[in-house]
Curated annotation (Swiss-Prot):
Involved in the biosynthesis of isopentenyl diphosphate (IPP) and dimethylallyl diphosphate (DMAPP), two major building blocks of isoprenoid compounds. Catalyzes the conversion of 4-diphosphocytidyl-2-C-methyl-D-erythritol 2-phosphate (CDP-ME2P) to 2-C-methyl-D-erythritol 2,4-cyclodiphosphate (ME-CPP) with a corresponding release of cytidine 5-monophosphate (CMP). GO terms for molecular function: 2-C-methyl-D-erythritol 2,4-cyclodiphosphate synthase activity; metal ion binding. SUPFAM superfamilies: IpsF-like (SSF69765). 4-CDP-2-C-methyl-D-erythritol 2-phosphate binds at residues 8-10, 34-35, 56-58, 61-65, 100-106, 132-135, 139, 142. This is 2-C-methyl-D-erythritol 2,4-cyclodiphosphate synthase. It catalyses: 4-CDP-2-C-methyl-D-erythritol 2-phosphate = 2-C-methyl-D-erythritol 2,4-cyclic diphosphate + CMP. InterPro entries: MECDP_synthase (IPR003526), MECDP_synthase_CS (IPR020555), MECDP_synthase_sf (IPR036571). Keywords: Isoprene biosynthesis, Lyase, Metal-binding. Its cofactor is a divalent metal cation. Pathway: Isoprenoid biosynthesis; isopentenyl diphosphate biosynthesis via DXP pathway; isopentenyl diphosphate from 1-deoxy-D-xylulose 5-phosphate: step 4/6. Its EC number is 4.6.1.12.
Length: 155
């Protein structure tokens, strides 16, 4: 058994929607990113890579590589999981937290869990996503960006 953790942060910028956990959420702003800016899946990728001692998302999908410009993070997640499976690992469970003052995540969490479970070829009960705010404190509280944290157990 091996544990991995991941963290990602993206600032808000131009746009009218965000992608979190593979779910498109209408919002008054977008997220600044080289790919689709899915902070939750980026944190999850880092957690998986870390658990398998495979580095981090920046090593595998550098933001200097135009091949990953506007990349779908669900595709990146599936690629990461393929690397783990090639080393003989499989997911036991994943627990993730989204830190955002806005938009509200609760209406979208069940869809996020389903998409992540599909991408990791696991039962939805092995995937947990929760959301919290910072009670208007810090950059998340000022609605300047979104943070995501992920912890995984692999075997």
């Amino acid at each position: 058994m091996r544990i991995g953790q991941g963290v990602d942060v993206h600032a808000f910028g131009d746009g009218d929607k965000i992608v979190i956990g593979g779910v498109v959420i209408p919002y008054e702003r977008g997220l600044v990113a080289h790919s689709d800016g899915d902070v939750l899946l980026h944190a999850l990728c880092d957690a998986l890579l870390g658990a398998a001692a495979l580095g981090d998302i920046g090593k595998h999908f550098p933001d200097t590589d135009s091949a990953y410009k506007n990349a779908c993070s669900r595709t990146l997640l599936r690629m990461v999981y393929s690397k783990l499976k090639a080393k003989g690992y499989s997911l036991v469970n994943a627990d993730m937290t989204i830190v955002a003052q806005a938009p509200k995540m609760a209406p979208h969490i069940s869809d996020m869990r389903a998409k992540i479970a599909e991408d990791l070829d696991t039962h939805i009960d092995n995937i947990n996503v929760k959301a919290t705010t910072t009670e208007q404190l810090g950059f998340n509280g000022r609605k300047e960006g979104i943070t995501a944290l992920a912890t995984v157990l692999i075997k």
